[in-house]
Design a protein with these regions (language model features):
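Divalent metal-coordination and catalytic microenvironments
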Residues: 21, 69, 99, 141, ...
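Short glycine/threonine-rich loop-to-helix capping motif typified by GTGT followed
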Residues: 242-243, 247, 295-304
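Histidine/acidic-residue-rich, glycine-tolerant segments that coordinate divalent metal ions
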Residues: 56, 76-78, 84-94, 101, ...
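Oxyanion-binding "anion nests"
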Residues: 263-271, 275-280
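A short beta-alpha structural unit
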Residues: 233-237, 286-301
């Protein structure tokens, strides 16, 4: 069977699936409308979907090695301003990262593979994942056994991308990292509140937070290999309610992104050390919480080789 030709035949249905999911964008772990739609479609195609944690899975095939096909399906907490007829009407959620595409494409893939199930040499397991944006979904489904029963031998996933790249272009990396690690952190600086006219009577957590922020940037400038891509960003800095009062606490939140495990471990460890020791110098303290701990995505060279073997010019 020409799978590419069959996919083109299903184009209108794939578009309709994408637009429904887009118009009903949901965020986080709980995606009731999206999950129900995915499960209904899989049942319509003859599969037997089940919940796996907060996600959905289904399996088909004839035994043997197991290939997992994964798509995320959550949106983002932001308003949509596209003006499209299928725009999300809530004003609070939107599919602006492409996960509506991913889920719709995997639904069509499931339909095509179900049609050809008798000819498959092996087993295909489908994974519809929530909460990719909050770094919770994959962990949730792994903890509920997505990689077991049957045990997964290899996995494939994809992500669409906007911009100037032509439609049909595939990007992958057979020599290293495809996507960076993401270690999200929250630093709560604890000081001592006082009136702004009497700073000597308190411990200023804003001052401590500023010094922590500046010191963290030196980790990239002086402690990581400039030939490697590493980024440390503080995206939130919140403190205080009044202009003339030194608050009790200040909160910094940020992310560390790297393309290798060695410097990921270095930066996470040094972030904690710098925050703790800087606070101590200024008579304060810190509480550090890791919000996310996602390793870098490194493409499997064997899977990459198999994928390349099935590419043909007319499909690229």
């Amino acid at each position: 069977m020409d799978f590419y030709k069959r996919a083109l035949e299903l184009k209108d249905e794939t578009v309709a699936d994408r637009r429904y999911i887009h118009q009903n964008a949901e965020t986080g772990l709980e995606l009731p409308k999206t999950k129900a739609y995915v499960m209904d479609k899989l049942k319509e195609y003859g599969l037997d979907p089940v919940e796996c944690g907060e996600g959905v899975t289904a399996t088909l095939g004839n035994g043997g090695r197991v290939l997992l096909l994964r798509a995320d399906m959550d949106g983002l907490p932001m308003p949509e301003e596209s003006g499209e007829a299928f725009a999300c009407p809530t004003g609070k959620t939107a599919h602006t990262c492409g996960h509506d595409f991913h889920a719709a494409m995997l639904l069509s893939a499931a339909r095509i593979l179900k049609e050809q199930e008798s000819k498959l040499k092996g087993t295909v397991k489908f994974m519809f994942q929530p909460a990719e944006e909050t770094f919770q979904g994959s962990k949730n489904m792994i903890e509920h056994g997505i990689l077991e029963n049957p045990k997964v031998d290899a996995a494939l996933a994809y992500h669409v991308s906007p911009g100037k790249m032509p439609v049909g272009l595939f990007m992958y990396n057979d020599k290293g990292t495809m996507m960076y690690s993401v270690d999200g952190f929250k630093i709560t600086v604890k000081g001592k509140g006082s009136h702004g006219a009497y700073p000597h009577a308190g411990v200023d957590p804003i001052n401590i937070g500023v010094h922590i922020h500046l010191a963290l940037q030196e980790l990239i400038a002086r402690e990581t290999d400039p030939a490697h891509a590493c980024v440390l960003t503080i995206g939130q800095f919140k403190a205080g309610e009044a202009a003339n009062i030194i608050p009790e606490t200040a909160v910094l939140q940020g992310t560390i992104r790297t393309n290798n495990t060695k410097e990921r471990e270095l930066l996470v460890r040094r972030m904690k050390e710098v925050a703790e020791k800087t606070a101590d110098v200024y008579n304060g303290s810190v509480e550090i919480e890791m919000i996310s701990e996602v390793p870098p995505l490194i493409c499997n060279p064997v899977s990459y080789t198999h994928l390349r073997a099935h590419e043909t010019p007319e499909h690229l």
